[in-house]
Amino acid sequence: MKRHYLWMFAAIMICGATVLTSCSEDDNPSQPEQPENGYSASTQELITLVNSNAQLKSLLEKAIAKGVEINPDRETNPAQTLSEYYDFIEWAAHAMPWSVVTQPEGTDIFTRIDQSLNYFFFINDIPLDELDGQTLYNNSLQYFEPYRTWLKTFAKAWGAYLDTEDSWNQAYYDIVAKEDTFGISKGWYEDASNWKTFNQFFARKLSSPAVRPIASPEDNSVVVSPADACTQGVWQIDEDGYIVQDDEVGVQVKSKKFSSIAELVGPNSQYRDAFNGGTLTHSFLNVYDYHRYHFPMAGKVKEANLIEADYAVGGTITWNPKTKKYDLFCDTPGWQSIETRGCVILDTPDYGVVALLPIGMMPVTSVNWAPEVKVGAEVTKGQELGHFLFGGSDFVILFQSGISFTLKPQLFSHQLMGEELGRLD
């Protein structure tokens, strides 16, 4: 099923160099000028890589050229040459998420961010025949070294900018405050004076636990939503530890490796095989959502690992000529095993061990634990587990064999953290 995810606006960072937008100056009042001595470090690093690697240069030029064939419109596909691509990523490293790609006047922020984000990965996710048969997640440039590593460099550079006070001001606050989807006017969040940077806004705290009541807090058979997020479904895990996928659902992962629960849980976990024959469910956070995640059940922390991996789109991007928009397909699980992520193993009294995996996505891909999350800690349902910084985000829960999980909300419906996600038997 096609899903447009604003949260992916994280990826916008890559998207945005010299693209002129339909936004007013107030939308991005402190737009940085290009340095007098040339490009910034992350852009210059890519230029150096391309100039020293003929294969990389050929692949990047081919991806850009194929993008022009698919969508020649300069307003929605502005980087149509290699030099224009350099300018584009230079701009993106200091751009606000809503000020990158031209959109019709009056377009809401959700769409502006969504399309800007998706655009960058449209180029990076274009299939290239030259990369067939290399056991990559797919045959696109974002998984090809050294471009893959450069994406991490770029993401960290943009994340550093979003941690500066240049990334937040009253004008930016006014932009998000007028959008009902962000919920700023609902009294959910801490005082806005606490936000000095964009990332402080993005990882905003609740004003009180009362604004996110926890369903059946003493009953561990009631699993609550770990975040404000849209439910994506429930999948069985076979006895060999692979996700069972319907061939007719979404875009299928080509290699069985990427459906491996052991790969998802991570190389350093003692519980890599603990979920064979079990169940997987995951929920997707949108960009406007509350980006702190909480324990969906009570228990004891057995492991808490951070797994450094790719800074990739998480799914597949296509251009829809009818709607003139970029579409992201990411419902089908498997891509989570390639993303930078966290994994907490929670030992519950009656339902075995449960794996909790916050999944970071491009571009900043920042997964963070709350200070209290340590091995041996006893935690309560609804207690804060951690937070994402700017970027796309997903949350996966794994249950062991013999534990029956029934999803309560309608598929793809939006839940608030603490609402009932499902029941265990």
Predicted regions and their residues:
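Hydrophobic helical h-region of N-terminal Sec-dependent signal peptides
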Residues: 9-14
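Bacterial Sec-dependent N-terminal signal peptides
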Residues: 2-5, 16-37
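N-terminal leader/targeting segments
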Residues: 3, 15, 112-116
